[in-house]
Amino acid sequence: MDNQKNLLLAVIFSLIVLIGYDFFFNPKTKVNQQNTEIEQNKTPIQNDEDVPSLLSKDFSSKIKLDEKRINFASKRLMGSINLYGATFDDILLRDYFKTIDRKENIKILSKENSPTPYFFRMGWASTDKTIPMPNKVSLWKAEKESFDENEPIKLTWNNGKGVKFDRVIKIDENFMISVEDEVTNQSGKDIELTNYSYLRRINYRPQNKFFILHEGPLGVFNDTLKEVSYDEIEEENEIVEVTKNGWIGYTDHYWQVAIFPENDKPFKARFKNLKNSINSVQIDFLNESIKSLPNNQSMKIKSYIFAGAKEVPLIDDYIDKLQINKLDLSVDFGWFYFLTKPLFYALHFLSGLFGNFGIGIIILTICIRIVLFPLANKSFKSMNAMRILTPEIQRLRERYKDDRAKMNQEMFAMYKEKKINPASGCLPILIQIPIFFALYKVLFVSIEMRHAPFFGWINDLYLSGNFISTSSFKSTSLKFVYTLNEETSPSFILRALGNTSHFPKGNFFPFKFS
């Protein structure tokens, strides 16, 4: 019996080390930077220095002195836009709050004069340095003082040399903002130009570093998600990717800001460490397609910005409507994506059906127990058969205590005679471990769990405080493995998920099963 336990523990521990390390510490995906499908454009605009003011050190000096703003409000967003640079630097979520008392809204973007500036700008660059392009200090004119999801707003900037820029900004009823620029050339000559965008975050690092969750810069390049840590950017100073049909952004635990360039257009994305500021990173893209605009003609280009909560059904809806490539990967479902996302939708359906997220967790756990019952039962039968042989095993150990090779030979002969495989209970256990990890991951990343009420005194299923620590996860994993090996009833699955899962401060579930 001890040999069987040792075998099970050895296999399970090896599995946790091999899978758990890769999954939870999540080494960054190596993306092939040689893009054979995209032709590199050999125009004068090839490097970051050619992008006007993109890396200017006096980034906010003029804007701090003189602000002009337009306000906006939609069903789920509110804030303002600074007309200097047409800067998005003030966005709040109307239906999400910092604390459960619902007094202070979640702020997505912050002004440049705030303690932690976080803002987004779009600009244009030309191969002709004599033609002024809109940048961070350009003062745009607005046709009105405010707008909402029902009526977009038009901004205009004229360079004084015959080139006019019209920018139409629309917000939908959720978290998507569309920006359509129209450039009209009446300069008397043809011009070449391209667009860029950048998102800058200053004086910020995540307060709680969850080792199973990525928070920070990320993007999709060549159909592959790339998550970049702040430490990587500081070490390498600059990380560059060239792709098309991709996007870049910042992700937090529950919120994100992402930029989506034109589809099917190659662009160069960059993650840049800002040395002149502490804990500051800029992510930007430069459109690699240099466009020629003849005199007396105009051109349009459209981009999208997502600024809001990572609600999976909404994100999937944007993927379908706007053809955004793999936006759902911004929700950190991890390596067990094939398990975690279906589990999320099952939980989403059940919590909607019963009107309570906690009830949804209970029902989903019961469903998992039912599905895993055949495996649990098989494991139980195998372990029970081994228990029956325990007296015989003890006698063999006493008889051959000085000859381990002979003892093992006699034990395996006994297993063969009794038609028992001592490892037959191992496979069912190994199959259940990824499901355990996936269920935990779903509950950890689901924004629906944040500030979700249950019953009675339980008004927040998330349980405020540090949600998880490495030590608590290791402890819980060991408890789970111990439970799988020691229970004599198929109900061990439910007990393992309910009674032994102490991920937060307190129980992972606000209830226990018996």
What kind of feature is each model-predicted range?
Residues 44, 115-116, 242-245, 483, ...:
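Short amphipathic alpha-helical "recognition" segments used for binding
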Residues 14, 23-106:
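Juxtamembrane extramembrane loops of integral membrane proteins
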Residues 5, 52-53, 63, 75, ...:
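Intrinsic-disorder/low-complexity peptide segments enriched for small residues
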Residues 20, 46-48, 250, 262:
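Intrinsically disordered, low-complexity regulatory regions of eukaryotic regulatory proteins
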